[in-house]
Amino acid sequence: MDIFRVLTRGASVKKESGPKAKAADYSVINGNDENHKEDNNESQIVKELDFFRNKRIISKVEDDREKTTENDSPNKEEKSGNDDGLIKPVITNTVEASALRKSYKGNVSGIDIPLPIGSFEDLISRFSFDKRLLNNLIENGFTEPTPIQCECIPVALNNRDVLACGPTGSGKTLAFLIPLVQQIIDDKQTAGLKGLIISPTKELANQIFIECFKLSYKIFLEKKRPLQVALLSKSLGAKLKNKVVSDKKYDIIISTPLRLIDVVKNEALDLSKVKHLIFDEADKLFDKTFVEQSDDILSACREPSLRKAMFSATIPSNVEEIAQSIMMDPVRVIIGHKEAANTNIEQKLIFCGNEEGKLIAIRQLVQEGEFKPPIIIFLESITRAKALYHELMYDRINVDVIHAERTALQRDRIIERFKTGELWCLICTDVLARGIDFKGVNLVINYDVPGSSQAYVHRIGRTGRGGRSGKAITFYTKQDSVAIKPIINVMKQSGCEVSEWMDKMAKMTRKEKESIKNGKAHKERKQITTVPKMDKAKRRRQQEMIAASKRRKNEELSKKHFSK
């Protein structure tokens, strides 16, 4: 399979046809045409979400659905429909449920836990699942639920609070979007905001928005009103504040915390009637950076029957405590281990001795043929990311760097080049560890050891997505002796083979845990460079001589000026 073909499964704009998505506020009104494009032979691969070009993807989704099926094969109807020869599993009792959970290492706890589903068709008999929604799932290549979807969808459709943890790329987004769309279809009340999804980053919010649009396509509510989804952009926020757009126009809104709070405080958006509140990447939304904002959002949602859901690839103990305090009899769903990485990822540690050794290690990967693009390299700071970029660029590696200091247009162009295969390697910081969602990445390199096990899981989760395999390599030096201990724990919990010395490594002491938590385990690192020390000293002396010469000239000029 051409990996860059997989990577570039984004969409392009065809402005001449199809209903246009409103670019100003990212709101979506579903179309009503009846012809659909059949999935190709790679339909099992989840389509890539180009979050920097959401308007373009929306147009593509609409265009694809408007194309006729004149060239479709005669057997297309049989392929798109249910195969009578295929027996879909239906879970009818707790014994079958236990067997299913054991098969995917699911750990579900709580009071009166609903039975999981064995297939999407199972939802029709159990929950009167909307056939238009099921059709949208199948047309987008989602034919079978993933383990986390098997558990979370029936829990949510029973109107229960849920705390869910699953590996990166395990289908968590659909696990909360499918029941949300179904519950809004079932709600026969008047129009108004019913579903609210909170994401820590704009990129992730864009991604959720695109998926929600695909699911809600051609779904109509009361009086033939289309289900409306919106991404709370700066433009839409201004329209809500100025009353250009009614806050009752949308059924689902997706937003980052600060932007939502700004609109709510200006009384431009009423959250008191919201019935479904979802926190994606809950571990980030309830850490010290976002916890106050998340609390403000919870306070604004005053509906007595409010259903709350939290999803993430990692669930620290403090997030579990918060969940228990704000949720009503929640069902806790853990797929695999809550601190483990995706089992499709081969994890490896490489000792480099010092900072110079890391550059040598990358060059060895290139020479040995392990540097297989597409590749993402993570570093701990923007300064170090820039330095590594310059080093690899001079090695003639097809590389670019993306970080918070780059403009939106620059990030847009870099992502586009990476998707099309023009770029082989992308260097970035932790700021984008949760936002980038490419399905074809072969290798992730942690040039710097991550600051926590959660950061490590999210970093390496950029590969091994959609059921494909991937590889993650972490470089470490002598000064990382404490910082790598959480990484080794994640590797063990993920079922990776570890060296004998890793098994014999002493457990972390309380002092070491505190140092990692407070960021003290990561000491100041040397500059990334291959320039010899003698050359550095020579350059430094030259710079000092130039500075001294300029200083003398300025002093002479000032003396002449005052003497006059």
From Swiss-Prot:
Its EC number is 3.6.4.13. A motif (DEAD box) lies at residues 280-283. Gene3D superfamilies: P-loop containing nucleotide triphosphate hydrolases. It catalyses: ATP + H2O = ADP + phosphate + H(+). InterPro entries: DDX52/Rok1_DEADc, DEAD/DEAH_box_helicase_dom, DEAD_box_RNA_helicase, Helicase_ATP-bd, Helicase_C-like, P-loop_NTPase, RNA-helicase_DEAD-box_CS, RNA_helicase_DEAD_Q_motif. It holds the Pfam family Helicase_C. It is an enzyme of class 3 (hydrolase). Keywords: ATP-binding, Helicase, Hydrolase, Nucleotide-binding, Nucleus, Ribosome biogenesis, RNA-binding, rRNA processing. Residues 153-333 form the Helicase ATP-binding domain. ATP binds at G166, P167, T168, G169, S170, G171, K172, T173. Changing K172 to G/R/S/W: Slow cell growth. Residues 1-45, 62-87, 512-564 are annotated as: Disordered. Residues 344-506 form the Helicase C-terminal domain. The keyword Transferase does not apply. GO terms for biological process: endonucleolytic cleavage in 5'-ETS of tricistronic rRNA transcript (SSU-rRNA, 5.8S rRNA, LSU-rRNA); endonucleolytic cleavage in ITS1 to separate SSU-rRNA from 5.8S rRNA and LSU-rRNA from tricistronic rRNA transcript (SSU-rRNA, 5.8S rRNA, LSU-rRNA); endonucleolytic cleavage to generate mature 5'-end of SSU-rRNA from (SSU-rRNA, 5.8S rRNA, LSU-rRNA); maturation of SSU-rRNA; snoRNA localization. Its main location: nucleus. It comes from the Eukaryota. GO terms for molecular function: ATP binding; ATP hydrolysis activity; ATP-dependent activity, acting on RNA; RNA binding; RNA helicase activity. A motif (Q motif) lies at residues 122-150. PROSITE patterns: DEAD_ATP_HELICASE, HELICASE_ATP_BIND_1, HELICASE_CTER, Q_MOTIF. Interacts with the U3 snoRNA and is associated with the 90S and 40S pre-ribosomes. This association requires the presence of RRP5. Also interacts with OSH3. ATP-dependent RNA helicase involved in 40S ribosomal subunit biogenesis. Required for the processing and cleavage of 35S pre-rRNA at sites A0, A1, and A2, leading to mature 18S rRNA. May also have a gene-specific regulatory function since it affects nuclear fusion by regulating KAR4 expression and contributes with KEM1 to ISP-1 sensitivity. This is ATP-dependent RNA helicase ROK1. It comes from Saccharomyces cerevisiae (strain ATCC 204508 / S288c) (Baker's yeast). The lineage of its organism: Eukaryota, Fungi, Dikarya, Ascomycota, Saccharomycotina.
